[in-house]
């Protein structure tokens, strides 16, 4: 019996389309397991006294995304995957779970203006697509992991107003796309990496405001700001010194004038007494 090759090809094509459709439908129902693990672990590591994450439940973690939207507060999706987490100013406490890195498609992470403590997990290095990292205004401590610089697409690193210590990793200066950098008001020490402070013409790559508030941090552009401060103090000192010197000279002049005047008056009195007739 002759085989109808056209029929066989059509059958195989339909079967392939069915499999792809079934797989897509299954993903839409269950979501991505990496995103589910990411959200589950992050929720377990955070405390939510204001109950802002009340809909962060397991039933939603199974399928957090519906195309480009999500029912979860602070979660933004793109093509069925989480690509942005924005949980800013929600009074959150706790720590950042290292398993947050399971959100492998994440491009923006903003946990700013909370009360999150602990260290910044080095596992954030696995966010290969991450462009924005904002963990500012929290209570994060410990050293900044240089491994975060493995996120080659980073263009924003904002860690200001925390309790971070140690040195600024020089690897951050190797991030070619980095356009915004702020580690001010921490407990950082050591010299500012030259590749973060290098000049672009007459301007530094990042100015002093990116580094201020770290008492043991030094180097350009902080040194220039300190020198300007010293110059102002010197000017004030010179002004005060000049004023005091002028007062001393004036006072001395008055004293000398009074002394001379007193002596002249005594001489005049003597002359008058000699010229008066004796009766």
UniProtKB/Swiss-Prot annotation:
Tell me the leader sequence span. Answer: 1-31
Q: Which PROSITE patterns match?
A: LRR
Subcellular location(s): the record lists: Cell membrane
Its transmembrane ranges are 229-249
**Keywords recorded for this protein, A-Z:** Cell membrane, Glycoprotein, Leucine-rich repeat, Membrane, Receptor, Repeat, Signal, Transmembrane, Transmembrane helix
Q: Which Pfam families match?
A: LRR_1 (PF00560), LRR_4 (PF12799), LRRNT_2 (PF08263)
Q: Which domain of life is it from?
A: Eukaryota
Name of this protein = Receptor-like protein 57
Q: Which organism is it from?
A: Arabidopsis thaliana
Upper classification of the organism: Eukaryota, Viridiplantae, Streptophyta, Embryophyta, Tracheophyta
